[in-house]
C-alpha cells in the first residue's frame, strides 16, 4: 500500500473509500493500486 498526500484514481476499477476519517483507494482487480492518504 502506498501512502500519499494526495490520492487519485489510477484506473477505472479504483474506488475511494473513507474509513475512520482516512481516505483509501481500493482496487479488487488490480490490488497494486492500493493507496492511503497520510
Swiss-Prot record:
Keyword terms: Ribonucleoprotein, Ribosomal protein
An example Gene Ontology molecular-function term: structural constituent of ribosome
Listed GO biological process terms: translation
InterPro entries referenced in this protein's UniProt entry, alphabetically: Ribosomal_bL36 (IPR000473), Ribosomal_bL36_sp (IPR035977), Ribosomal_L36_bact (IPR047621)
An example Gene Ontology CC term for this record: ribosome
Family: Belongs to the bacterial ribosomal protein bL36 family.
PANTHER family, alphabetized: 50S RIBOSOMAL PROTEIN L36 2 (PTHR47781), LARGE RIBOSOMAL SUBUNIT PROTEIN BL36B (PTHR47781:SF1)
HAMAP family: Ribosomal_bL36
Name of protein: Large ribosomal subunit protein bL36
Species this protein is from: Amoebophilus asiaticus (strain 5a2)
